[in-house]
Amino acid sequence: MVEMVDPLTKKFIWSLPGGGIEQKETPLVAAKRELFEETGHEAEDWAFLEQTRYDFGWNGRMVPCLGEWFRARTPNVSDTHTIIDAHVRAWAWIPLGQVSERLAYQPHVRWRTLHHLRDMI
């Protein structure tokens, strides 16, 4: 998970790595780019999970999102990393039991996230 700083409110929020799709990017290419920008890490064995509509609080307002969710494996991840995204304060592996209380998503998105994480264990 990544801890981000809202540019307007300066509030710290936890999220999964992600963000917008740039022009001519596929959702998968965008997911790989966002993971690297926000954690400094790359992953392999990517698989599409689902698409979800939700609102995400950012920059002092609720932003409507159409999320393309993927799972991936991150082999050989160390604690050293370079974060490229200026809004990301830190990244961390969070114990599964703490994910729901930390995620800044709406309840239905938190539930789906936990569902997919449990399926991966």
Task: Report residues per predicted region.
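N-terminal strand-loop-strand
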Residues: 1-16
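Detector for methionine-enriched segments
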Residues: 1-4, 62, 120
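Unchanged
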Residues: 21-107
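Charged phosphate-binding loop/patch that engages nucleotide di/tri-phosphates or the phosphate backbone
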Residues: 101, 105-121
